[in-house]
């Protein structure tokens, strides 16, 4: 029996294009200015040190910026990058320059599950800070109240079954009582291996239907009617 739903963001409830065509360029254009402006912030100092540790050497400020830009270009899911992007996007969302698109079918279903008191959790490679920003500034208003919790890469890699076991433990449920929704086939496999129920969201514009994929696929949240 499904007692909770764990949900990915990018390509699942929101178009992949928003992240790649709006959010990534927005952060890339502002990274250098943001770091220089916030060098005295203890959190930014820690993030810069984390970047140096990952690169395994001391870096000049210019090299730190170039490293972050390289990671953006390579679509790296690295925690210090996600944290910096979270800060930059926060400024954008709070100023009204950014507004998060949510698929209409996803919004309808999230609203329905909320009304049915089905606990929902988010698991995304974007930082928890960025996730909350996203859902507090959507085209449908502030949706953060829909969710009982948020998880990011601090929990673990989304393609590692252990990450899903940790989330199940954190929410106090057995994996088999959780339904995981994602557009990413590797994440679906990992969650299934951990024992979760899974459905791949196969929107043509984001992550097309995969022939002979061993798990259920739908192209709209409207097709998920058994909760």
UniProtKB/Swiss-Prot annotation:
CDD domains: HAD_EP
GO biological process, one term: L-methionine salvage from methylthioadenosine
Catalytic activity as recorded in UniProt: 5-methylsulfanyl-2,3-dioxopentyl phosphate + H2O = 1,2-dihydroxy-5-(methylsulfanyl)pent-1-en-3-one + phosphate
Cofactor (UniProt): Mg(2+)
Cofactor note: Binds 1 Mg(2+) ion per subunit.
Keywords: Amino-acid biosynthesis, Hydrolase, Magnesium, Metal-binding, Methionine biosynthesis
Listed EC numbers: 3.1.3.77
Any one Gene Ontology molecular-function term assigned to this protein's record: 2,3-diketo-5-methylthiopentyl-1-phosphate enolase activity
Pathway: Amino-acid biosynthesis; L-methionine biosynthesis via salvage pathway; L-methionine from S-methyl-5-thio-alpha-D-ribose 1-phosphate: step 3/6; Amino-acid biosynthesis; L-methionine biosynthesis via salvage pathway; L-methionine from S-methyl-5-thio-alpha-D-ribose 1-phosphate: step 4/6
Free-text function comment from the UniProt entry: Bifunctional enzyme that catalyzes the enolization of 2,3-diketo-5-methylthiopentyl-1-phosphate (DK-MTP-1-P) into the intermediate 2-hydroxy-3-keto-5-methylthiopentenyl-1-phosphate (HK-MTPenyl-1-P), which is then dephosphorylated to form the acireductone 1,2-dihydroxy-3-keto-5-methylthiopentene (DHK-MTPene).
HAMAP family in the cross-refs: Salvage_MtnC
Subunit comment: Monomer.
The protein's name: Enolase-phosphatase E1
Biological source species: Persephonella marina (strain DSM 14350 / EX-H1)
